[in-house]
Every structure is written in C-alpha cells, then in structure tokens.
Amino acid sequence: MKNLSAFVLLCLLATALLPHSVHAQKRAYRAPEFAYNWGKPGLHPDHIVLNMPEDPSTSMSVTWRTSVDVQAGYAEIAIATAAPKFWRNAKTYKAHTEILEATDIPRAEVVSKYHSVTFTELLPDTTYAYRVGDGRIWSEWIHFKTAPDGDQPFSFLYVGDTQNYIMELWSRLIRAGYQKAPEAGFIVHAGDLVNYAHDEGEWHEWFMAGSFIHRMLPSVSTPGNHEYYPRTEEERAQRIRSLSVQWEPGFTLPDNGPAGLKETVYYLDYGAMRLISLNSNVRQEEQVPWLEEVLADNPQKWTVVTYHHPLYSASSGRDNQQLRELWKPIFDKYQVDLVIQGHDHSYARGRTEPDKNQLAGLNMRDQYVGTAYVVSVSGGKMYNMRPDGWDDFKGATRDRGAENTQLFQVISIDDDRLSFEAYTATGQLYDAFDLEKTAAGKPNRFIERQDEAIPVRTHDNTISYYDQLPDGVTEKLEAQHPGFRVISVTYYDEPEFRGYRVLLSDDEERLVLRTDPEGNVVK
C-alpha cells in the first residue's frame, strides 16, 4: 500500500510539472497596471541615460529628466578610485536644459525638463564616476568607462525590439545581458524601444526596466517604426508620422548625420570599429550620399551598421525590397562587415556572397563571406519565421533562426576577429559565428560555430506563445467559415467575459468570434 501511495504521488507530481497545454490554455495573463502618475517627472533626476559622442574615447554624454520645478541642471565627474572621496577631484558642468511641452499630445500628456551634458577631455579606457542633479538634489554616483584608444579588444551588447511587455519581460532580458557581459562597452538598441512613440508611461517602463544599466552602459539607439506616430489629429488625417517627442530631448546622440535626420542617422568610432546608425523609417534615399561619404572615409578595420527594418526579413509575410535595393549595393561596395537589425520579432542570421569581382568563383558554401546580417528580438512579442528561410532572396542564405525566444547578443572585436554570440534570456548560447579579416580588399573568412549552441527553438518545441482552442474547435470554426483560417486566439478570464477571442482571416477580410471556455460561439 505504501509503495502504491508513493507511486500515485510521484505520478501526480510529474503531471503537475509537465508543461501541459490544457493547463496553459486555461490561464489568462494578468498584465501589470501602473498608476497614472507612475511615470511622471519629479524633483529627483530620473531617465538617466548615457550616450556616446562621435569619439567616446575622450567624451561622453548624459541626459536626464526632472519636473519643470527644477530650475537648472548640473553634472559632476571625476576619475573613479577605490577611495570614497574621489569627488574631491570632480569637475562640474552646467547642463543644457530644455522643456518638453507635450500635455496636448495623446499618450504623452506631460510637461517636463530634460537636462544634458557632454563631458569632454576625458582619458581613453578610463573608469569615471559621475552624478547629476540641480546642485541640491543629486543622483547616486555612477560609473562608466571610456572607449579604448586604438586596437584594444572590446565587446558590446545588441538587442532587437523591446516594444511590448517592457517592464515585466524585457527587464529580465537586459539584466541577463549585463550579467553575461558586464565589461561590455555599450548597448545597441535596433529600434522599437516602445510600442507607442509618444507614450510617457512606456518610456518610463523602458528606463525602469534598464535601470542602472542605462546609466552605466551607453545606449546606441536607432528608431523603429513604433518610434513614429501622429502627434495630433491633423497629422493623423494627413497620415503624417512624427518621431517620438521624447527622442531628441531624452537622448544625446551624435549630431553628425544628414540635415533633418538629427540623432537618428549618425556614426561614431569605438576602438577599431565604425558604428553607423541609419533611419529605415523615413527619407531613406537622402541618407545614401551621407552613407557613401562616411564609408569612403573610414579608417577603421571593422564596420557595423544598425537600423530597424531588415534587408532580409526574418518573419513570414515581410520583405523590404526597396530598402534592400537601395542600401545593399553600398554595403557591398564598401565591404560592411556586420548589419544588426530588428522589426521582425523573431531571430534570423545569415550572410551574403562576396563580391565575385573581388574573388571569382566563390559560392555561399565557401568559407569566405560578404556582409553578415542578423535580425533579433529582445521583448516579449513574437512572430513566426519565414518557412522558406531566405531562399527567396537572391545571393543570401539564412544559417540560423529562432521563434518564440527572447535574445540578446554579445559582439566582441579583438584585432582581426569579430565574434558574435546570441544568448537566450536564461543565458543559454543560441548562436555563434566568427568573422576573420584576411588580406586587404578580400572578403572576411567565415567561421560557423552554431554547433556550440542549443538546438533550434520554434513555436513547436517551446511553451506556446499563442492561446490554444480546445481540441477540434479550430477545425469546426474553419469548416463553418469556408476560406477562413484561425490566425490568433486569446483567452480571457474577466468578470464580464470568460472564454476565447478568435480572429479568422481569408487574407482579404477578417472575422472576430467569441466562444465560451468549451469553444462554443457566443454573441
């Protein structure tokens, strides 16, 4: 009897631990709610973020936010030492202050002050401590390290779209990235930092989720399509989408891009790398002459480009052909090494063939490679991968993909080698490859390392991202509506409604149905 009881208990425990779909489909997600004034500015500095100027080995910029009651802003900086009174050697900077008046802009509904300082005449590869405030109310002292001077090794983090579930889910991802690469020099954010461009609450989530990481590791941010949205009903009527009202006052990014694209198109040099941000949302053709100039006059060994919309899409139903035809020839001409992108809410990593005029006879399976392209996602919103990989894209191949997986990437450069590693939010190595410089003017040598990583992750072998209808209900609904297929299911457990919201589509028309928990259609 004792053995039988133990067996029954073991079976029950095993059943409870299984990620059983029946258990999952009956659980409605309880999204956090934030108080209306949760993200409003106050007397204490918040939204503190570091950004790098054109030369981050000798300068660094910091920006922060306060209420309009704060009259002025100041920043103090000193070389950090183990002695706690390093501040005796601090230098004080008066901040540039501007007011953001956005009380009439939907979702912003705020008036605040932004303060910014650019520290200059810094020493390369040196740890500094700084603080910001109004002369009476100060932040904590915060460390950062300037860029190395020359060919010293360095690493940085790269993340794709944050956008959704920022505080509740992106926070764990960015903290895992910092934990994996605490010595990283900076973080590249490849667009869609928020979901609604002007939403003050979402921007507050972004700053809270990153917390001290934004204050210690400089952010290199490029705008995504969700950083653009109409500010007024007039703009909406004219289909005008404006850059987030928080972007320019909230960041201090290099101002060396084309006119009219301030702090969205720019470049900076870090160690032996030139890093270029492009704006894939607007005025793409106007960026071409500037890009040609920046690439033609490039003394750095490595070149990395970031922007939002991928040239080679990762997800189903997407293709940015015009952008690919516009920018890829330039990347090829100047042998851009790596392009890091977002937008598609899945992961794809691949490469293009080298210019055959440089090394005739090479093909995609040779060890030499043209530009390597990566698309990644760091937030909690997920899409499906393209089922055909990159087979539709001439001259490109996808080597690795992922669905339903939050990822961060660590990119390291050491002399003639660039190492790329993608990690899951739980710190597992998901993808890896190296690029190795060869003779001048020749393509990079490509070294595949995905055999070091965990198996491919898809919607089929991970905890379901989508809610699931009870067995047989999908087939029943599709039979009742010929030509339509179920494309999304959301389970609700609210006082006013408990059951499923089902979206069906025939590619031209959409149909929304509601069912009870058993799958019976209700009005």
Which residues are covered by each model-predicted region?
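Bacterial Sec-dependent N-terminal signal peptides
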Residues: 1-26
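Active-site neighborhood of phospho(di)ester-bond hydrolases with catalytic His/Asp-centered motifs
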Residues: 158-160, 186-192, 218-225, 278-279, ...
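Extended active-site neighborhood of metal-dependent phosphoesterases/phosphodiesterases
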Residues: 109, 113-119, 127-143, 202-299, ...
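Active-site-proximal segments of metal-dependent phosphoesterases and phosphodiesterases across multiple
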Residues: 298-341, 357-360, 391, 396
